[in-house]
Swiss-Prot record:
This is Large ribosomal subunit protein uL2. The keyword RNA-binding applies. GO terms for molecular function: rRNA binding; structural constituent of ribosome; transferase activity. Keywords: Ribonucleoprotein, Ribosomal protein, RNA-binding, rRNA-binding. SMART domains: Ribosomal_L2, Ribosomal_L2_C. It comes from Clostridium tetani (strain Massachusetts / E88).
């Protein structure tokens, strides 16, 4: 993939960059795998804002992605590589030999015409999905399950890959992109390779309008508000926030305050936290 850099014809264009989408082969998605996506604008069923800075954006349809990869032993041929507005990674439309069509997260290097397969007997090749117990130690994987048969939950975004570090007993040790090292059951499935669109993280949005088209509204600083709207608000001119450490709009500690439960069930499965 390539990154397009724009000439500084306007102030917003100066540091703007965009994807060239060289891997994309079609702009027409498979209609049978599309469903309507209702926008909430960050509101709950009572109409109250529960997630700030959401709203607007371009209309989009949701692409049904096969995260389970449970069609074992049946080869599938890659028909197209497509853009998905709902995620940072590209997706691939695969057609099985029995005629069924499914979308999968496209790994880096997957091309139209490639054949992929799922199941314990699959080869160690990008795009193939196997139980972790059948994957060699040291292999880079993505789309990792946390519970067998539930579907992939880890390492699904653009450019992501985890490394299989060890296998012992019923558990495998996996190093995640965040730096966290944790145990995963060896019956859980993972897909070989790295997620596509690896240069996504170095792209610069460049201007506010592109962010609005993505469905994000502006984030206003608390110190720019009135005291009735935020604990940091008020004061004459540009004043400090007037407290020892920053807080959220609701008065809870912010920036550095640990929000993870101290006795979470998965603590025993995490060997090394990403911040350690």
């Amino acid at each position: 993939m390539g990154i397009k850099l724009f000439k500084p014809t306007t102030p917003s264009r100066r540091n703007m960059s965009a994807n060239t989408f060289e891997e994309i082969t079609t702009d027409k998605p498979e209609k049978s795998l599309l469903v309507s996506l209702k926008r909430t604008g960050g509101r709950n069923s009572q109409g109250k804002i529960t997630v700030r800075h959401r709203g607007g954006g371009a209309k989009r349809k949701y692409r049904i992605i096969d995260f389970k990869r449970d069609k074992d032993g049946i080869p599938a041929k890659v028909a197209t590589i497509e853009y998905d507005p709902n995620r940072t990674a590209f997706i691939a439309l695969v057609v099985y030999t029995d005629g069924e069509k499914r979308y999968i997260i496209a790994p880096q290097g997957l091309k139209v015409g490639d054949v992929i397969v799922s199941g314990p007997d699959a080869d160690i090749k990008a795009g193939n999905c196997l139980p972790i117990k059948n994957i060699p130690v040291g292999t880079f994987v993505h789309n990792i399950e946390l519970a067998s048969g539930k579907g992939a939950q880890l390492v699904r975004s653009a450019g992501g890959s985890a490394q299989l570090m060890a296998k012992e007993g019923n558990y495998a040790t996996i190093k995640l992109p965040s730096g966290e090292t944790r145990y995963v059951r060896i019956e859980c499935r993972a897909t070989i390779g790295t997620v596509s669109n690896v240069k996504h993280e170095i792209m610069s949005i460049g201007k506010a309008g592109r962010k609005r088209k993505m469905g994000f509204r502006p984030t206003v600083r608390g110190s720019a508000m009135n005291p009735c709207d935020h604990p940091h608000g008020g004061g004459e001119g540009r004043t400090p926030i007037g407290m020892s450490s920053p807080v959220t709009p609701w008065g809870k500690p912010a920036l550095g305050y640990k929000t993870r439960k101290t006795k979470k069930y998965s603590d025993r499965l995490i060997i090394k936290r990403k911040n350690d």
